[in-house]
C-alpha cells in the first residue's frame, strides 16, 4: 500500500468527507487544494478530527477551520445535567416520536432520498432537537435524535447532529415564533428551485389558502453558514422557502405543521 505525506486534491471543486477518510487511510498528513475549493462541513470535521492540515498550492499551509460539529470533536464538553434532563424529559420524548413519524412520512412520500433531509424542533430557549447526519429518514428512531444549542454545538445524543443544522438555527434566530423546521427535497418543488422559479398562484386552492406565496433563495453550498444565511431576508414573511438548486425548507409551530407545508407545496 502506498503511504504519503500529502494528498493532492487540487482537481476537486468540492472536498467531501470520503476524500478525507481516503487520505487518512493512506497515511496523508496534509491536503493540497486550490483557491476557492469548497470543503463540506463533514469533511471539515474529518480534517479536524484526524489532525490534518490543508494547503493551497499557491499559499502556505494552514489548519482547517474548526467545525461546529461538537459530536465529531473528541474534546467537546460533556452535556450538562440540565441538558440531559431536558433531553430525556417526557416533552422531549414526545417530540422525538413526532420527528421520527415525520421523517418516515417524508421518506414514504419520496420527499427525501438516501440520507437527505433534516428535521428539528426548538424545545427550549437555547436547545434544539434534531435528526442525525448520514441517516435515512426511513431508519429514524427516537434514540438517534440529537440536541444542540443555538450555535450548533451538540449537547446531548449519541449520534452526530445533521450537518445542515445551521439552516434550522438561522430560522429560529430570525423568527422567534418558529418551533418546528423541516428541510426536504420534493421532486416537483425542487425542480422549481433548480429552474429559478416559484410556483404560480391561482392554480390549486389548497396551495393559495394553506401556503400562499413562497420565496426563492440564491444557491450556496449546503451545510455552510452562508447557505443558512440565504433565508434571512425571507423567513419572517414566508413559512415556505425554495432553496436555490437544492430543495425546500418550511417552519411552523410544530414539526407536523411544517411538514404539512411541504406536502401542500
Regions found by a protein language model. Give the residues of each.
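Glycine-rich flexible loops
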Residues: 65-265
Amino acid at each position: 500500500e502506498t503511504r504519503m505525506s500529502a494528498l493532492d486534491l487540487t482537481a476537486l471543486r468540492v472536498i467531501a468527507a470520503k476524500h478525507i477518510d481516503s487520505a487518512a487511510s493512506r497515511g496523508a498528513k496534509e491536503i493540497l487544494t486550490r483557491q476557492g475549493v469548497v470543503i463540506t462541513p463533514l469533511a471539515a470535521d474529518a480534517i479536524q478530527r484526524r489532525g490534518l492540515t490543508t494547503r493551497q498550492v499557491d499559499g502556505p499551509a494552514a489548519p482547517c477551520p474548526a467545525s461546529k460539529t461538537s459530536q465529531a470533536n473528541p474534546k467537546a464538553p460533556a452535556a450538562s445535567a440540565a441538558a440531559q434532563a431536558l433531553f430525556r424529559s417526557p416533552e422531549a420524548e414526545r417530540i422525538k416520536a413526532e420527528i421520527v413519524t415525520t421523517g418516515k412520512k417524508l421518506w414514504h412520500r419520496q420527499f427525501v432520498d438516501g440520507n437527505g433531509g433534516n428535521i428539528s424542533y426548538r424545545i427550549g430557549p437555547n436547545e434544539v432537537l434534531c435528526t442525525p447526519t448520514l441517516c435515512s429518514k426511513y431508519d429514524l428512531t427516537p434514540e438517534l435524535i440529537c440536541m444542540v444549542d443555538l450555535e450548533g454545538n451538540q449537547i446531548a445524543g449519541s449520534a452526530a447532529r445533521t450537518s445542515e443544522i445551521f439552516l434550522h438555527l438561522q430560522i429560529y434566530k430570525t423568527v422567534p415564533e418558529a418551533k418546528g423546521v423541516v428541510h426536504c427535497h420534493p421532486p416537483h418543488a425542487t425542480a422549481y428551485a433548480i429552474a429559478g422559479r416559484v410556483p404560480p398562484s391561482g392554480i390549486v386552492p389548497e396551495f393559495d389558502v394553506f401556503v400562499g406565496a413562497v420565496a426563492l433563495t440564491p444557491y450556496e453550498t449546503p451545510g455552510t453558514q452562508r447557505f443558512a444565511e440565504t433565508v434571512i431576508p425571507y423567513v419572517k414573511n414566508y413559512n415556505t422557502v425554495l432553496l436555490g438548486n437544492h430543495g425546500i425548507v418550511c417552519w411552523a409551530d410544530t414539526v407536523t405543521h411544517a411538514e404539512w407545508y411541504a406536502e401542500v407545496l
